[in-house]
From Swiss-Prot:
It comes from the Bacteria. This is sn-glycerol-3-phosphate import ATP-binding protein UgpC. InterPro entries: AAA+_ATPase, ABC_transporter-like_ATP-bd, ABC_transporter-like_CS, ABC_transpr_MalK-like, ABC_transpr_MalK/UgpC-like, Mo/tungstate-bd_C_term_dom, NA-bd_OB-fold, P-loop_NTPase. ATP binds at residues 37-44. It is an enzyme of class 7 (translocase). Belongs to the ABC transporter superfamily. sn-glycerol-3-phosphate importer (TC 3.A.1.1.3) family. It catalyses: sn-glycerol 3-phosphate(out) + ATP + H2O = sn-glycerol 3-phosphate(in) + ADP + phosphate + H(+). The keyword Membrane applies. Residues 4-235 form the ABC transporter domain. GO terms for cellular component: ATP-binding cassette (ABC) transporter complex, substrate-binding subunit-containing.
Amino acid sequence: MAKLSLRNVQKTYAGGTQVVHGIDMEIADGEFIVIVGPSGCGKSTLLRMVAGLETITGGEIHIGDKVVNDLEPAARDIAMVFQNYALYPHMSVYDNMAYGLKIRGMSKGEIEQRVKHAAGILELASLLDRKPRALSGGQRQRVAMGRAIVREPSVFLFDEPLSNLDAKLRVQMRLELKDLHRRLKTTSLYVTHDQVEAMTLADRMMVLNGGRVEQIGTPLEVYARPASTFVAGFIGSPPMNLVPVARNGSGQGVAQMRVQPKDGQAAATLGHLPMGLHLPEQALMGLRPEHIEPCAVHEAIAELDVRVVEALGADSFAYGSLGGQPIVVRLDSQTQVRAGDKLPITASAEHLHFFDVQSGKRIEAQA
């Protein structure tokens, strides 16, 4: 195991197109880091640079105390698990897992010990004689992981390893990956576009957008205090509501703002905001659907014009608008709302977020 350091890491292709912009991160020995972002944000490129499959055009990558920029992949003491299993179809599970060790000239006894140990961890012991065609998708992915585990690397690299699995298998494999890391405690770098994988697997996560770091933090930190409107809209399902607001004065310790109207709608005033804060003159106000609560009319910060209600069993989502701006609210199964209703809503101070209108960066409301 080893720590991993990314220091001002950059990637620019011929022609001047820069796809990774000066990324810095210190990853502790044994830490599980998830790089998450939309397609094309540079996350797989960054992972491939760590692996040695892409050249680095700026900065340094350290594995342990060694700068690995110019080292071949085989010399970096890493093991990589890809989205495609890349198993040899003519080889058994045992031989697929053992092949890399044979190439390295390891003794037969050591190979057998490592393969059987990994097979035990991954519940593959009864499948070692089977060919890949006789395995399910989840079993094939476990073989691919086993092939990485037997190398006993300093760092595991995962490039969207669950993307080819169906929804049920992805849930199962997420749990198995979490348990696997708990037991092995190997430094891991995991790439995904799936925020659920990021939230459930990561010790810390890096949110990438356009090759730049938007935020690094624990899943709870990123969820509770998004650093930008991009993070607020990317992490969370449904994403955070973002509403343009303008200051409307304050008095007696209670702030007021109005929603900037859309499509000729009348402005909606947000009254009784539960805080006496110096708020910006204009901002984007963020509020997660699960942090908006129905309430009595006299306690409401606003009334939502309900347009559509989706009932999902344990809870439901009410889609509506304030001043023409779209808002979604998560409701429990006991709250009965129908399309066309006006729903009085409120929210507590700690769940209100404000972002700069121009930059999208988080701003703190000052007491």
